UniProtKB/Swiss-Prot annotation:
NCBIfam families: PRK05339.1 (NF003742). This is Probable pyruvate, phosphate dikinase regulatory protein, chloroplastic. It is found in: Plastid, Chloroplast. Residues 1-49 form a transit peptide. The lineage of its organism: Eukaryota, Viridiplantae, Streptophyta, Embryophyta, Tracheophyta.
């Protein structure tokens, strides 16, 4: 492999020429597709008071009573501040992924009162149902589109540059930002991310670097072409832009390990078009199969599925199925409905491929209410989103799971689709003993033990959790 010192001098001269005589319209605006994406509460904006969610009619007397005692208005706490740490994490993570806001005060807002400020009245610690309902309400409001904010001028910008789709750069940056979740939300560190994909010529590359210099952005790039990657590095150095090559260290490490030089051909290169691999066609076939098997359709084909998901309505069976299908797994999902028997073919197939999904009833009720509102029958008489019906369906599902202890049951409350999919894939491969990926720790004949735990709330069995632990 060639080192950075042996890069062709023509790229250095091209960069110098571009920087010496820039065209009049050289600055490139941020990508409109990702413009305005932010990972911070709106209270971080200087001089902008934090917006508060509209209170319900049952909350107004409580706020008036709290404010009349001290003679001054007090800022009510957001529902997102209530509940357990797991539910807090769920709400924050959803805000991060969607680029929407959470009504959380920053350190400046919390500490601006000073010594003379009257103490804020404290509210009693909510019950588990109230906490779950509050966090679920925040997540549902975000999903419905409330609280979408524009671009934060005070935010730090991160530019992601790729010569392909940008999938690697985007997911790498999102994974890294997860390590700063405590700052992005709790401490008000504003971050904007902008994706520039399909960058395959020097002109566009220089435009992006100059725009990054103007905004003081960090440039992270995944460029397969070594000359483009080196040119990006030099351009960032000339313009004083902090940068990092995400892809190159990994490529060099693999090349050194296997003793083969990389091709250096970007995915978007015409020379690579038309080279569709067997894995590609297998993924397309899996997606086609999964779509046809959605929501219990064509139960006669369950034996052809790699994975079968069962659970009550709105436990995320369909999005999880599609996500797994994009990884090449043929997935079928079967709904559990009270009064409707499960298809006979479900019990005739290999039971090792069946996975159950369960969820907290309070969160499920909030999701169903949002679903009913979307479908337009929110005000109509229906037990679809009533708590008694929700509890009954989950109890019915738990009875089915108890009758089939070989089915792993995964708790999906507050989990992203990627997290649930990772659990499913890990159990699937461990059972089939087909995992081709090397394990971090060497294990011999993995033994899987399932612990059944039930949580009692108001004398009702809310849900059963099954934890898979490796020994």
């Amino acid at each position: 492999m060639s080192s950075s010192s042996s890069t062709s001098p023509r790229f250095g001269s091209m960069i110098s020429a571009k920087l010496a005589s820039p065209p009049p319209s050289l600055l490139l605006p941020p990508s409109p597709r990702l413009q305005g994406r932010r990972l911070t509460p709106p209270s971080c904006t200087p001089g902008t008071p934090a917006a508060l969610p509209s209170p319900g009619p049952d909350k107004e007397p409580e706020r008036e009573a709290a404010g009349s005692g001290s003679g001054s208005a007090t800022t009510p706490r957001s529902p997102a501040q209530l509940g357990s740490s797991q539910l807090h994490r769920w709400s924050r993570a959803r805000a991060h992924r969607s680029g929407r806001r959470l009504e959380w005060p920053t350190i400046r807002d919390r500490g601006s009162g000073g010594a003379s400020s009257p103490p804020t009245p404290t509210r009693p610690h909510p019950s588990s149902d109230e906490a779950a309902s509050a966090a679920a309400k925040v997540a549902v409001e975000e999903e419905d589109g409330y609280g979408v904010v524009g671009r934060d001028e005070a935010a730090k910008s991160i530019y992601m540059v790729s010569d392909g789709t940008g999938w690697t750069a985007e997911h790498s940056v999102n994974a890294a930002l997860g390590q700063f979740e405590h700052c992005l939300v709790d401490r008000g560190c504003a971050v904007n991310t902008h994706l520039f994909n399909g960058i395959d010529d020097m002109d566009r590359l220089i435009e992006i670097v100059k725009q990054a210099a103007k905004e003081g952005a960090l440039v992270l790039y995944t460029l397969a072409d070594p000359s483009m990657a080196e040119a990006t590095k030099k351009a960032c150095e000339l313009w004083g832009v902090p940068s990092n090559d995400i892809l190159r260290p990994t490529i060099e490490a693999i090349a050194s390990h296997i003793g083969v030089a990389p091709s250096g051909i970007p995915r978007s290169s015409p020379s690579r078009k038309g080279q569709l691999t067997e894995d590609y066609f297998r993924r397309i076939e899996a997606i086609d199969f999964t779509i046809k098997q959605d929501d219990g359709a064509q139960p006669q084909n369950l034996n052809r599925a790699h994975i079968v998901l069962v659970g009550v309505s709105r436990t995320g069976k369909t999005p999880l199925s599609i996500y797994l299908a994009q990884k090449g797994y043929k997935v079928a999902n079967v709904p559990i409905v009270m009064g409707v028997n499960l298809p006979k073919s479900l019990f005739e197939i290999d039971q090792d491929k069946i996975f159950g999904l369960t969820i907290n009833p309070v969160v499920l009720q909030a999701i169903r209410k949002a679903r009913a509102k979307t479908l337009g029958f929110h005000g109509q008489k229906s037990n679809y989103a009533e708590m008694e019906h929700v509890r009954g369906e989950l109890d019915h599902a738990n009875q089915i799971f108890a009758q089939h202890p070989i089915w792993p049951v995964i708790e999906v409350t507050g989990k992203a689709i990627e997290e649930t999919a990772a659990v499913v894939v890990r159990i699937f491969h461990d059972r089939k003993q087909k995992c081709a990926m090397p394990r971090i720790s060497k294990r011999v004949a993995p033994i899987r033990i399932y612990d059944y735990l039930s949580e009692m709330v108001n004398t009702h069995v809310e849900y059963q959790k099954i934890f898979a632990r490796d020994f």
